[in-house]
Structure formats: structure tokens, C-alpha cells
Amino acid sequence: MKVFITGGTGLVGSAVVAELVAAGHTVTALSRSVSSAERAEAAGVTPLRGSLTDLEVLRAGAERAEGVIHLAFGNDFSSPEAIARDVTEEAEALAALAGPLIGTGRPLVTVAGTPVAPGRASTEEDPLPTEGPVGGRSESVARVLALAPRGVRAAAVRLPRTVHHDGRGGFAGLLTEHARRTGVARNTRAAGRRGAAAPP
């Protein structure tokens, strides 16, 4: 299968790419920098230069693919405005990726987070939160899933709140880096609260 992936050189994406290549799929990865393109090539995939704001590049990548996986996100959490910008950027990118797939029966896979369920462990049946700084991401996922009746094999994989690799990446990576820098490891879990963490 010919697969187009965004975020293919990121933490989760690099693990997904490795699985796709090992299974014999032909992969094209959106690459926003020279170093990202080099990492894509080293992983055995074809880089397609562009970013999530290059909507024509995204459409072209999706048009040529037999399936699309969207994993990229801006990850600028420096301010509410930056987060809002990243959420809007992702919504527009997903719309661009979805357009060429409508009516084709080809898959579009994206990711969603794990919601908080007060007093119990959450499940995949729990609704995604649409409130808060990244609530718009849940709305984007809902729009992707709503494409199923329009001939898109739409899916959203729910990732745990923390995805990490060797102490790098995600919230666990931030905590690990802080502990390495300061010599102090913090426990951010309130009494009785549980959370999921997993490697990619």
C-alpha cells in the first residue's frame, strides 16, 4: 500500500513508519525541514517537503496515496494563542488531507487523546473533551470520523496521555528532562489518580 504520513519522523510517527516499512508498504512522509527529510530517507521512506500549512502539498500527498496517516501537530504550548494556532492549523490540514479521499474508500487515520473520567479509568467509549485549550483537536477528530458515510475509511487511534521513548518525548520527556537538569523527580499524580503511559 502507498501511505502518506504527516509527523512520520516524530516520536510516534517514527515507530509507525518502521512498522509500515517492515510490512512492505511504500511510505511518503511530510518533511518540513532538511533534517526531517534526511531522517525520513534514512528510515526508508520518500520525503515530501512541506508543512501542515502547505495545504496544496498535503492534498497532493493524499491524492497519490492509498491511505493517509496524520500524526503531526505543532506542539507549541508556549501560550494560549500558540495552542489555538496549532489547533486551527491541524483542522485545516486534516480538511486538506481528507478532500482527495472522499468517495474513494481509502483510509484516513488520525490520533486522539485519552479523556479524563473522574473517579474511574477512562475507556475508548468516553467522549473526547471539546473544552479547554486543545478541545478543538477533539472537534477535528469528530470531523474526520464523520467522513465515514462519505466514503472515507476514517479512524482515530486513542493514544495514552503520555507517549515516551527512552525518557524522551511527550509529558514524560518533559519530566525526565527536568529531573536530569535539576536532580529532582516530581510526581504529578494527585492521590488516587491514574494515568496511562506507553512507548510508541
Give a label for each model feature.
Residues 3-25:
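N-terminal Rossmann NAD(P)H-binding glycine-rich loop of SDR-like oxidoreductase domains
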Residues 6, 66-71, 110-111:
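Rossmann-fold scaffold of SDR-type NAD(P)-dependent oxidoreductases
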Residues 143-166:
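Conserved beta-loop-beta element that borders a ligand/cofactor-binding pocket
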Residues 138, 164-174:
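Glycine/proline-rich active-site loop of Rossmann-fold NAD(P)-dependent oxidoreductases
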Residues 75, 113-117, 160-163, 182:
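Active-site segment of SDR-like NAD(P)-dependent oxidoreductases
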Residues 31-92:
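NAD(P)H-binding glycine-rich loop region in Rossmannoid oxidoreductase-like domains
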